[in-house]
């Protein structure tokens, strides 16, 4: 009932709407030859103090001579000049070490800012571990090392150029470089955790929203909390789609994180964090939504 009530409100609300709108796009990528990529568009109406999921473009695949990458680009480009941010769920820039053009002494003795930070951070963490491991700055970034150790919930942050993320980074880079829009990086699992805890959702649901057997129910609970609290308006068919399709759900979460960043509700870089390194946008622990 709460879902249907929120859906009815969304239909009535958008039918009557006139005025300013702020848009945020979220992208959940899959492998370039797969058909799982999704794009979501979230709209914020300051006059009405409402957030609305206006569109989901799902299961984007290559057809004949038309690539899925071009479909994604054209869809986003249609909003050029009307979007505050485009949020990718993967990195699109190679680790800084991999792009450095300075004479290389080896990362064991390199004095570049981010290498010094990574070395110090790694040394502090390795004091607690056996066997000790050295970091690899050509595959991983400072932000991944930071988030692995400094947030309240342990999460697996794979290296940007690790086996799992490297193909997605290449695809995101290809798409992003053609866009003339502000782009940010989001780690959906962390955004879901922070948003869910702010809504007092069970930790089990937040930890297993991707699970093959219980993920659908976890996504339903999370979406129910957002809609029943009037924090986001979602059409019923989109609600069902996001319950059934995790890529669609995470694209929505990426776009929603873009809204939180726009309203100053994502975490800033910590003091001393390398100035030339990438950053992942993720929500603060305490959030305020439009009411």
At which residue positions do the language-model features occur?
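Intrinsically disordered, low-complexity segments enriched in serine/proline and basic residues
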Residues: 1-18
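RNase H-like (RuvC/DEDD) metal-dependent nuclease/polynucleotide-processing core
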Residues: 19-25, 29-291
């Amino acid at each position: 009932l709460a879902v249907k009530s929120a859906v009815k409100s969304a239909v009535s609300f958008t039918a009557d709407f006139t005025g300013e709108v702020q848009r945020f796009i979220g992208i959940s990528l899959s492998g370039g030859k797969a058909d799982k990529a999704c794009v979501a568009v979230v709209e914020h109406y300051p006059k009405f103090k409402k957030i609305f999921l206006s569109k989901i473009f799902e299961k984007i695949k290559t057809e004949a001579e038309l690539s899925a990458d071009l479909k994604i680009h054209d869809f986003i480009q249609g909003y050029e000049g009307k979007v505050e941010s485009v949020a990718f769920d993967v990195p699109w820039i190679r680790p800084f070490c991999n792009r450095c053009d300075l004479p290389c002494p080896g990362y064991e003795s390199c004095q570049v800012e981010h290498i010094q930070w990574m070395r110090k951070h790694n040394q502090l963490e390795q004091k607690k571990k056996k066997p000790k491991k050295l970091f690899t700055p050509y595959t991983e970034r400072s932000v991944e090392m930071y988030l692995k150790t400094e947030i309240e919930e342990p999460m697996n942050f794979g290296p940007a150029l690790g086996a799992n993320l490297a193909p997605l980074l290449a695809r995101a880079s290809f798409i992003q470089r053609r866009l003339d829009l502000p782009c940010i990086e989001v780690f959906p699992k962390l955004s879901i955790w922070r948003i869910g805890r702010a809504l007092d959702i069970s930790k089990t649901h937040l930890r297993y929203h991707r699970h093959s057997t219980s993920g659908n129910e976890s996504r339903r609970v999370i979406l129910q909390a957002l809609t029943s609290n009037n924090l986001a308006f979602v059409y019923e068919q989109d609600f069902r789609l996001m319950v059934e399709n995790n890529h669609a759900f995470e694209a929505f979460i990426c776009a929603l994180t873009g809204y939180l960043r726009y309203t100053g509700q994502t975490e800033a870089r910590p003091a001393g964090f390398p100035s030339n390194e990438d950053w992942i946008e993720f929500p603060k622990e305490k959030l305020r939504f439009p009411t």
